[in-house]
Structure formats: C-alpha cells, structure tokens
C-alpha cells in the first residue's frame, strides 16, 4: 500500500485518500499554478497510526523520507543542511473541511546553526530569527502541548521592555533574545532541550497532526458536522514560502465571492510581513484584499486571474490561502469556501444563472443544516431606531443576538446550562473556545478580521458574530470592557448585529425572519426532485401556520397532551384523575371535549386539506397532578376531598419507571372513556371545518405506545365505534384512518401482525431509540460525554438516528408492514425527522413521509431532495 503521494501524483478526486487540502494542492499543481511543492501523507496512514497504538511504523517513515529526497531534487535544497536548508510546513487536511480544528507547524527544519546561515545568506537577520521564534512556539504548542500563552506573555514582556506595540517592530536582536527565552521556557516545561535534528522535528510534527484528529475541539466539530472518526486526517508537508521576509512579502486569505452575502466580488484580507497563521489567528487586523493592487499591482492581477480560473474549474466559490515571498505569489490552499446559509443560496442560484451548474447540482451544493440560520430572527426595525449604538466591528456572521455579557467560553457554557442567553466577548477566539461559542447567542471579538477563527466558525455554526472591534478596551482579568465611553461588566446586557457589525447597549427585541427570493427557488428545485413528503410536528395553529409557510404538507404529529396543560384545562384533567367512578371521569372529560374540539378545528383550518395526524393521550397521568402544597390543597377543595385523600391519589400514580409505565395506549385500555372523548372531539372538529370551509378532511388518529396487536385492536374498536356514532348522529359521511406509532421494539418485531389493523405506521424514534438503547433521553447526557471521549458512540443517538440498531428495526417494520398491508402509509415523527442523515435513511428504506418541528421543515425538504438525487446517481 502506498502511504505518501507527491503533489504531482494526485488530483481533486482523491480527497478520501489525500484529504481536501492535499487533493486540491495536487489539482492546483496539475493546473500549473504556483504551488510550493511537497507531498501528502494519506488518511490511511493516520488510521494505521491509531491501529498501531499511536506509532508511525517503519514502512510509512521510509516513504516519508523517500519523498523528502524527491522534494530536495525538485527544490535544489537539502533537508537539515546548514548551507542550503529545505524548510517545510506541516499541516493537517481532512476529507471534509475543518477550519481551525486541527494543528499546523511552520518553518520546520530550523535550528541554531541553520538560522545563523539563513540570516547571513538572506541579509535579513530579522526574518530568520522571526521564523525561528515562531517555529519554537508552534512546535512547543502543537507537538509538546506547552500552551501558547506562556510564549505570548514573553512576547508582550519583550514589547513592553522595548517600548513597542507590534511584533513587527521588534528587531533581529530582540527576536534572537526572544528565541533564547522560548527555548528556556520549553526546557522548563518539557524537561529537555528543544530538538535540533530536523528528522526528529518532522516525525514529531507528523505525529502531532495525526494526534490533533482526536483532540477535543476536533471531536466536537466532527460530531456537529457528521464527520466520522474513522476517516482520519491526511498530513501535508510542503516547502515553505515566506511571507515574513519584509515589506515585499505578505500573506492572505481570500474568497472568490462574499461568504457572508454571496455577492460576486473578491473578498479577503492580507498582511504584509507576516505568516499565514497571523491572518487566520486574528492576532493582527489585516487590510482588505483590494488594497493589494496599490501595494503590488502585478501580484494582485496574477492573483485575480488565479481566483477566476479556480472558481471556473471547481464550479463553486473558493476559499484560498496565499503567500507572497519577495513579490512572488504562491498558492497554499484552495477549497470550497464555508459560507452563511444566505450566501449559499445566492451563490447556488447565481451559478445556475451563469450556466456553471444545473439546478440539481445547486440542490446538492447546500448543506441542509445551514438553512436553520436563515429562519432566525433579526432585530425589530422600530426598536433599532431608538437603540443606543455604542460601536461597530466587522459584520462577520449574520443574524441578531442579545444577551448578558460573558468573557470566557467556560462561563458561556455555565450560563447556557442555567437558562441564560449570553454574548461571548473575547479579545480573539481560539479553537479551544468552540463549546462556549456554541453556547452563546452571539460572539464579539476585539481582534481579527472576516477570516479569523471567530468569523469562520461562527458562520459555520450559524451564530451571529461581530469581529475586529478595535475600539474596545478589554480588561479580561476584571471581566470588563470599555466601548463608546461606557464600561460594561460581566452580565451587563448588549445586542450585536452580525449583518451590519453594529453593537448596541441593552437588549433589543427581535422579529422572525422573512424568506423570499433565492430560498424559494432552491426549495422549488428541491421539491422537484424529492420523493418523501414533509410534514410537521405541531400542537398549535401558530406552529401549524409557520410550518405551512415553510412548506409543510400536513401535520405528522399533534401531541394532544400539550393542550391539557393550559390553566382552564388542567383543572378538568385533575378532576378526571381524582374521579372514583367511570361516570365521574366522563363528567370531567365532558368539560375538556369542547376545548379539544376547538383546538382540532383550529389545526384543521390552518392545514386546510392537508393531513393532520392526532396522537391520543400519551404521558403518564402523574405529569398532570400538582406537586406544590397550595395546589394540592386547592385541588382537594374543588374535588370535595381531604388533602390526605388527594395525596394518596398522587402517591398511587407514582411509578418507578414512568416512561415504560402506565402511559400511551395503556391509558386508553384502562380508561376507554379518554379515547372516546378524544375521538368525539376529532370527528366533530373535522365535520365542522369540512362544512365551514367546504374541504375534504380525512382525520388520522394515532394510537401511541402499542407493543401488542391486541392492544391496537381493542383501542381501534373503541375509536371506530365512537367515530361511527358521531358520523351517524351528524348524518355526515367521512373517511378516517386509524394507525399507530411504532416506538416499542416489540411493535417493530411484530409489525406484520400490527399492520393488519393499522392504516398507517409512524415511527416514534425518540421512544424507539430510548427503548432500543435502554437509556433515557433525559439521563443520557450524564454519561454520553464519556462515551464520545472513549469512541463508544460518535453521535447523540437522539439527534441522529442510529441506523445499525434502531434503523434496522425501522427497516424491518417497514418491510413486514408493507408485506402484510401493501396500502399502509409509513412515516417518522421523532426529532430525527429533521436530521439530514436520518432523512436520507428514511428515503432509502422507502418511508412515505418525515415529520419534524416547523423550523426544520426546509431542512427536511432539501435533505429529501438530496437523498433522492444521491439514490438516482
């Protein structure tokens, strides 16, 4: 097996083996673009590294050094040589883009001897020592895990001592002194001298990149973005191009279109006399890319030509990294750029209009999960008129955020856990902050541009971000910042607008986003290709109308118990629970029936002639009884019972495992009068709206938690008998369907029997997951973190359908059900109905529809189209 490929040996179709970065470096080499040469160590080598107990075996090491020899032949330089040294960068490059998630080392191959020779030969001692101190810092941080902060402190102390504010103002002698301090810091932390042998440095760096595939921030990012652990990362070893050689050198990052809006213009930033990490890390605030034409017009023109060539070649917006070494341009990377959902839609539609791609390709270009961000609120325009604007940064990631100020990622996580909405304010963010960024409504940074870590990650997560607000004077130690003559402390309130970059004092109210234009076009294309229908889970007319606006084709799950918790209804439910006889229960239920009917009428009106599936009462009765002493006393008074009697009734409802207890169809078996009341309400509501609106309604009644066909038979008989009585009394003809949720493993295993009694199955994957795994959704959070760390699970099975186990049950039940009843309709109504990978699974096993929460309807529509296109290909 071949583990190492020169850039000249690969191409863009080898990304599974070479990773995205390696495949694209190979492709740019093939296109004849100026790429510093090098080689890629494959993802299979990474997998092998972990299989061999985190060791790089002799076979792979031999290949690495064979390719170092080939690089020496290409460049005319020699690795480890004092007189003509070959210096390299070592970078990660996974199959899927993971910006800032893994680690990079620059200037590898330097030591005391080499740096002295470089200083003499180049006549630029400052550059040579700057490269060396950077290398010591990166190697210490990435390979030996000595935190960056120790070195940053030494830099700050040196700048203070020399009376300068910027790194670039330090002289060669200052940097030489700093390099010595760095090595002393390394020795004090590691216990040995900084390595001088380039071979040792290289192998240490390669191992570190492989290790970084498994670091906590990469694991979090992978889970959030459906990137399997088994993929591994490739490693790219590339000849250094130096952007820090002086005023005719620089480095930058650019996009062929605006990643925030999708507008067709070159957007990016560059820094003179800097290395690539300076731009991405956001340590210095760079200049806009179009200023490059004033500084180096020829280099700018060459770069613009390359950008055009790359976009036309890849048929997508490109995100590129480049370095200028003494007026020579080098391309270090290209990839399909991360973009906001709004930009993704515009870019896809524009590329179709420009004739570059088809509508089918446009549908496949968009990550369905990102659509979520389009549907998020913006600030109320009237409220904005009176808002107090205190400053402005860069509009790094669109959206509106308002909340209490926190200064650390840890504080953001804690606040979120306590139900608070927060805005994370940082000098700059780093990959370690990712969990805190996820927990925040928005992110505000003092440093960094549109391509800084904060900006890129926030855009990917759909979180509002304002970056590079340099007017902020930050005091991290005391957790305060000053902006616009005002000092803000921890937990003070601010609002930030990621679409304009504006920052406001206080909380500004938000309004729902309105969706038009490109969104409609993409959704129309998606609807053209998808086979699965998309319904919504909705219990209120407001939710139902929102879902219809977003393209829902019916309600796949209406949870009737949610209607019982309103103040006027809970009293009647409690009266029913406390009743001693069937008559008393029926009297209590008679009070609820007109309320339920009214609720159902509102849903039927909202959905018109689309299907509405109504699930009968599901939760255990203990959820409806009071727990506070005052409420118990009040219930006793209204029921004409003593407090002790009520407490005895409540105690009698206690169950050791209520989620597997007296709930679902078991309630209807024990108290048939509940099912009768709900049936009357469903049918009467359907009749009333059919007459009023002159539409055909076919009610769908769903019996929950069936595990035995006889349960369904028993409850179905009650439903049909009651429905027929109502229809006869009203002298009205109406078709209605009775089906069940498949949410108990036994129901899936005996689906052929159950299908004979059911008009439809709806897979309740929340409970089916709980019962198949044998753990509770509410308690799993306590241990799932350890399971992720130990690679037992890669994803939360309640968020992403477990296709091996739970999925096998779904597939089996679908097959058995269809064999027994070819006319049966099959759907899914758990939270998984809005997860793209789960939607694809539903398409592949032949379900008829998925049902999800209103705001996830567009996600499901697009995911269903992508599933159909993939299956066709």
Task: Annotate each language-model stretch with its function.
Residues 328-330, 427-438, 442-444, 450-457, ...:
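Glycine-rich phosphate/ribose-binding loops and adjacent secondary-structure elements
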Residues 39, 446-448, 467-470, 558, ...:
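Short beta->alpha connector loops at strand-helix junctions that form conserved
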Residues 91-92, 515, 525-873:
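Conserved alpha/beta-domain cores
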Residues 1-387, 414-416, 420-423, 430-435, ...:
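Nucleotide/phosphate-binding sheet-loop regions of phosphoryl- and nucleotidyl-transfer enzymes
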Residues 206, 375-407, 521-527, 531-536, ...:
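Flexible inter-domain linker/hinge segments
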Residues 236, 406, 423-425, 444, ...:
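Structural motif
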Residues 392-432, 483-521:
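Extended, non-globular alpha-helical segments
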């Amino acid at each position: 097996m071949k583990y190492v490929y020169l850039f000249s040996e690969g191409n863009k179709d080898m990304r599974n083996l070479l990773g995205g970065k390696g495949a694209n470096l190979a492709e740019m080499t093939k296109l004849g673009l100026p790429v510093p040469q090098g080689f890629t160590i494959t993802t299979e080598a990474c997998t092998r590294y972990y299989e061999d107990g985190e060791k790089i075996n002799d076979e792979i090491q031999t290949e690495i050094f064979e390719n170092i020899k080939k690089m020496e032949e290409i460049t005319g330089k020699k690795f480890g040589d004092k007189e003509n040294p070959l210096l390299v960068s070592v970078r990660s490059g996974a199959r899927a883009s993971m910006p800032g998630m893994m680690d990079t080392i620059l200037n590898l191959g330097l030591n005391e001897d080499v740096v002295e020779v470089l200083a003499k030969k180049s006549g630029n001692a400052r550059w040579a020592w700057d490269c060396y101190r950077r290398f010591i810092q990166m190697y210490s941080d990435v390979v030996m895990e000595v935190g960056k902060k120790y070195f940053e402190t030494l830099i700050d102390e040196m700048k203070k001592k020399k009376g300068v504010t910027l790194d670039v103002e330090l002289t060669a002698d200052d940097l030489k002194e700093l390099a010595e301090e760095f090595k002393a810091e390394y020795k004090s932390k590691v216990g040995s001298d900084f390595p001088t042998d380039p071979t040792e440095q290289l192998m240490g760096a390669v191992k570190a990149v492989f290790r970084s595939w498994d670091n906590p921030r990469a694991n979090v990012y992978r889970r959030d973005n459906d990137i399997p652990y088994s993929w591994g990362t490739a490693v790219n070893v590339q000849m250094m191009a130096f952007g820090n050689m002086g005023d005719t050198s620089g480095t930058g990052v650019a996009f062929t279109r605006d990643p925030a809006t999708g507008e067709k213009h070159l957007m990016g930033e560059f820094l003179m006399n800097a290395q690539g990490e300076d731009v991405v890390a956001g340590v210095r605030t760079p200049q806009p890319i179009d200023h490059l034409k004033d500084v180096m017009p020829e280099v700018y023109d060459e770069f613009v030509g390359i950008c055009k060539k790359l976009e036309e070649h890849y048929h997508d917006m490109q995100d590129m990294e480049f370095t200028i070494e003494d007026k020579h341009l080098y391309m270090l990377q290209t990839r399909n750029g991360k973009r906001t959902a709004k930009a993704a839609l515009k870019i896809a539609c524009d590329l179709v209009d420009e004739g570059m791609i088809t509508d089918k390709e446009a549908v496949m270009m968009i990550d369905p999960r990102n659509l979520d961000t389009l549907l998020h609120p913006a600030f109320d325009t009237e409220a904005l008129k009176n808002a107090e604007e205190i400053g402005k940064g860069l509009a790094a990631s669109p959206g509106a955020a308002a909340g209490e100020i926190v200064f650390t990622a840890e504080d953001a996580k804690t606040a979120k856990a306590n139900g608070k909405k927060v805005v994370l304010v940082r000098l700059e963010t780093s990959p370690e902050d990712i969990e805190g960024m996820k927990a925040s409504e928005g992110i505000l940074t003092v440093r960094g541009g549109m391509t800084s870590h904060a900006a890129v990650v926030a855009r990917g997560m759909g979180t509002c971000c304002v970056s590079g607000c340099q007017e902020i004077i930050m005091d991290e130690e005391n957790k305060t910042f000053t902006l616009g003559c005002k000092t803000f402390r921890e937990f003070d309130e601010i609002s930030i607008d990621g679409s304009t970059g504006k920052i406001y004092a206080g909380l500004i109210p938000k309004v729902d986003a309105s969706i038009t234009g490109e969104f409609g076009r993409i959704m129309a294309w998606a609807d053209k290709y998808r086979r699965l229908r998309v319904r919504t889970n909705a219990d209120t007319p407001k939710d139902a109308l929102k879902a219809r606006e977003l393209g829902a084709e019916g309600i796949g799950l209406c949870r009737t118990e949610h209607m019982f918790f309103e103040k006027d209804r809970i009293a009647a439910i409690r009266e029913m629970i406390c009743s001693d006889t069937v008559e008393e229960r029926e009297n209590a239920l008679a009070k609820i029936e007109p309320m339920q009917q009214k609720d159902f009428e509102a849903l039927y009106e909202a959905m018109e002639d689309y299907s509405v599936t109504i699930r009968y009462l599901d939760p255990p009765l203990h959820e409806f009884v009071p727990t506070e002493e005052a409420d118990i006393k009040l219930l006793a008074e209204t029921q004409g019972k003593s407090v002790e009697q009520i407490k005895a009734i409540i105690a009698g409802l206690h169950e050791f495992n209520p989620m597997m207890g007296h709930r679902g169809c078991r309630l209807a078996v024990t108290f048939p009068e509940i099912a009768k009341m709900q049936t009357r309400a469903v049918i009467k509501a359907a009749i009333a709206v059919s007459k009023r609106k002159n539409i055909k309604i076919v009610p769908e009644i769903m019996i929950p938690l069936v595990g035995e066909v006889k349960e369904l038979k028993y409850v179905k008989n009650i439903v049909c008998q009651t429905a027929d009585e109502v229809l006869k009394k009203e002298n009205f003809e109406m078709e209605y369907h009775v089906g069940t949720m498949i949410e108990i493993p036994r129901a899936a295993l005996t689906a052929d029997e159950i299908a004979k009694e059911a008009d439809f199955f709806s897979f309740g994957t929340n409970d089916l997951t709980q019962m198949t795994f044998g753990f509770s959704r509410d308690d799993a959070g306590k241990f799932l973190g350890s399971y992720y760390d130990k690679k037992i699970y890669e994803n939360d099975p309640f968020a992403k359908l477990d296709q091996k186990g739970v999925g096998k049950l779904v597939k089996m039940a679908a097959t058995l059900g269809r064999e027994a009843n070819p006319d049966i309709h099959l759907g899914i109504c758990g939270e998984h109905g809005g997860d793209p990978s789960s939607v694809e699974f539903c398409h592949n096993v032949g379900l008829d529809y998925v049902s999800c929460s209103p705001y996830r309807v567009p996600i499901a529509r697009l995911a269903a189209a992508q599933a159909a296109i993939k299956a066709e290909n």
